[in-house]
Curated annotation (Swiss-Prot):
CC cofactor note: Binds 1 [4Fe-4S] cluster per subunit. The cluster is coordinated with 3 cysteines and an exchangeable S-adenosyl-L-methionine.
Protein name: Phosphomethylpyrimidine synthase
Organism annotation: Klebsiella pneumoniae subsp. pneumoniae (strain ATCC 700721 / MGH 78578)
Keywords, ordered alphabetically: 4Fe-4S, Iron, Iron-sulfur, Lyase, Metal-binding, S-adenosyl-L-methionine, Thiamine biosynthesis, Zinc
Its job: Catalyzes the synthesis of the hydroxymethylpyrimidine phosphate (HMP-P) moiety of thiamine from aminoimidazole ribotide (AIR) in a radical S-adenosyl-L-methionine (SAM)-dependent reaction.
Gene: thiC
Length: 631
């Protein structure tokens, strides 16, 4: 990892150059494909990795090859992964879902913004240079209508978003013909239902039951539909956002694009610094993935960082502001109740959630119940009008191994289950946030408790970190826990970067965190037995055994690092066709030796077969033609 430290000005200039030169880019030897649905505007993007053929025989002059079919993989990069699409972040992305939203005739443009804060920002000419120029006119559900995907699902309606998701979740595996690639071990799903083929109707059923959510605000039409649920692929979230001391709008847009390139299924904007409103607008207009926020952060900024001065009115205005910009899901810490706060007094690390600590301080200062809990039904009404999903925050999550699975954590979890049922009364989509810091032997209980008390709503966890002794490597400590809880049924994993507990992550940290968590999510899919999850592994193993080095690089989650590590010791082009690597060398490569053994065994088998035929021939008297026996 590079240790070169850029100045603040250099970081911002680098981000500006990135934005100015941004273009759709494919991974090495990959191409963008689109799988079409039942109507012309359902075009589901995937990345197809092209592979080289396998040498199967012949001689030096006339070698004989066998084709290796391309491998389709899930792609979160949106237009940024398509070289044929022109990118201009100042214009934003195409509004993919706008025709679907308009066709439902259940929402209408607003004549003015509902948020007083938004109105004030728009009236401030001093912000013109920072403001995204192509502002949308926000929409809201018309009176008496509900615009959530949960509402449609409960009405028996299969939306275009649901069909898009069904195609996407199947990952193009119906295109794979090779029996070698299709082989897969049986998994242990711990009660998950994983059909061989995901249909739009199955997606609808899961959403209707509350077991899955489709974060898709009607004011974020640029987003490509995706789903979060135990019976689908495990998803990964990346956190970005500025702080009071670092980052800029340019850098956050760069981190957004970078996150989607490296596999972020959703992105949370956790900005706490200046220009939060303007930064979020730039992010939303350029994001092909759902965007989540923690509204209490911005609400706190509006009262100058003094938690005691927070009010429901300020928070409500913040919800309206963000919903009309297009935020797809809100983290709401409504389960931090006044009576739970004393339970944290005996903890080693107390309350470590920012949102949880803000609400705990407010409750103690006023000696009143959490206003998010008291006004939860009003929160649901707002979410239902824009289709903002709720991510019920775990404000009392454990911040150390010592505090794992304690009374405070599980008391809050049970309250989140109660709030889930209330949200469902309003047809609002819900997922539940989880820990945190949990040792390996205690992780599964978190999943079983959540399923029981939160009625199978999707679980979304931060890790969990399995040990506290590795600052600088907490993407590893948490990746272990993430893989485990993903296997047990967690639907989405919030990444942890190497900077966890140390500082705000930069672009390279974002990549490191995402690669770690894509590994964890994929390992969980394999363990669950998700249909088709093993195809890419099989393709990699076949390429590895056949010494197809270029294919090994290209099939990797990070082709660039794989190639760089190989080329550190074998940089010559001849090293890309060598039947060994620098680990063992030519004489001790186990796969080379195995191939020689296999070839020898095959040759021996042929020779033995020829000998048997020769013996049979002589036993029959050496006659070329045998007389037919009479009946």
């Amino acid at each position: 990892m590079s240790t070169t430290k850029l100045t603040r000005r250099e970081q911002r200039e680098h981000a500006q150059r990135f934005i100015d030169t941004l273009a759709g880019t494919a991974f090495p030897n990959s191409r963008r494909i689109y799988v079409h649905g039942s109507q012309a505007d359902i075009r589901v993007p995937m990345r197809e990795i092209q592979l080289s053929p396998t040498l199967v025989g012949g001689d030096k002059d006339k070698p004989r090859y066998e084709t290796n079919e391309p491998i389709p993989v899930y792609d979160t990069s949106g237009p940024y992964g398509d070289p044929d699409i022109s990118i201009d972040v100042r214009q934003g992305l195409a509004k993919l879902r706008q025709p679907w939203i308009d066709a439902r005739n259940d929402c209408a443009p607003l004549s003015e913004r509902s948020s007083a804060y938004t109105k004030a920002r728009l009236a401030d000419d001093g912000l013109d240079e920072l403001r995204f120029s192509g502002l949308l006119t926000p929409k809201r559900a018309v009176a008496g209508k509900c615009v959530t995907q949960l509402h449609y699902a409960r009405q028996g309606i299969v939306t275009p978003e649901m069909e898009f998701i069904a195609i996407r979740e199947n990952m193009g595996r119906e295109r794979i013909r090779s029996e070698v690639l299709r082989q897969q071990h049986a998994g242990e799903g711990f009660g998950a239902h994983l059909p061989e083929n995901i249909t739009p109707e199955f997606v609808r059923d899961e959403v209707a039951a509350g077991r899955a959510i489709i974060p898709a605000n009607i004011n974020h039409p640029e987003s490509e539909p995706m789903i979060i649920g135990r019976n689908f692929l495990v998803k990964v979230n990346a956190n970005i956002g500025n702080s009071a001391v670092t980052s800029s709008i340019e850098e956050e847009v760069e981190k957004l694009v970078w996150s989607t390139r490296w596999g972020a299924d959703t992105v949370m904007d956790l900005s706490t610094g200046r220009y939060i409103h303007e930064t979020r607008e730039w992010i939303l207009r350029n994001s092909p993935v759902p965007i989540g926020t923690v509204p209490i952060y911005q609400a706190l900024e509006k009262v100058n960082g003094i938690a005691e001065n927070l009010t429901w009115q300020v928070f409500r205005d913040t919800l309206l502001e963000q919903a009309e910009q297009g935020v797809d899901y809100f983290t709401i810490h409504a389960g931090v109740l006044l009576r739970y706060v004393p339970m944290t007094a005996k903890r080693l690390t107390g309350i470590v959630s920012r949102g949880g600590s803000i609400m705990a301080k407010w409750c103690l200062s006023h000696h009143q119940e959490n206003f998010l809990y008291q006004h939860f039904r009003e929160i649901c009404e707002i979410c239902a009008a824009y289709d903002v999903s709720l991510s019920l925050g775990d404000g009392l999550r454990p911040g150390s191994i010592q505090d794992a699975n304690d009374e405070a954590q599980f008391s809050e979890l049970r309250t989140l289950g109660e709030l889930t049922k209330i949200a469902w009364e309003y047809d609002v989509q819900v997922m539940i946030e989880g820990p945190g810091h949990v040792p390996m032997q205690m992780i599964r209980r978190n999943m079983t408790e959540q399923l029981e008390h939160c009625h199978e709503a999707p679980f979304y966890t931060l890790g969990p970190l399995t040990t506290d002794i590795a600052p600088g490597y907490d993407h590893f400590t948490s990746g272990i826990g993430a893989a485990m809880i993903g296997w047990f049924g967690c639907a989405m994993l919030c990444y942890v970067t190497p900077k966890e507990h140390l500082g705000l992550p930069n672009k390279e940290d974002v990549k490191q965190g995402l690669i770690t968590y894509k590994i964890a999510a994929h390992a969980a899919d394999l363990a669950k037995g998700h249909p088709g999850a093993q195809i890419r592994d099989n393709a990699m193993s076949k390429a590895r055994f056949e010494f197809r080095w270029e294919d090994q690089f290209n099939l990797a989650l990070d082709p660039f690092t794989a190639r760089a590590y190989h080329d550190e010791t074998l940089p010559q082009e001849s090293g890309k066709v060598a039947h060994f690597c620098s680990m063992c060398g030519p004489k001790f490569c186990s796969m080379k030796i195995t191939q020689e053994v296999r070839d020898y065994a095959a040759k021996q088998s042929i020779e033995a077969g020829m000998a048997d035929m020769s013996n049979n021939f002589r036993a029959r008297g050496g006659e070329i033609y045998l007389k037919q026996e009479e009946a």
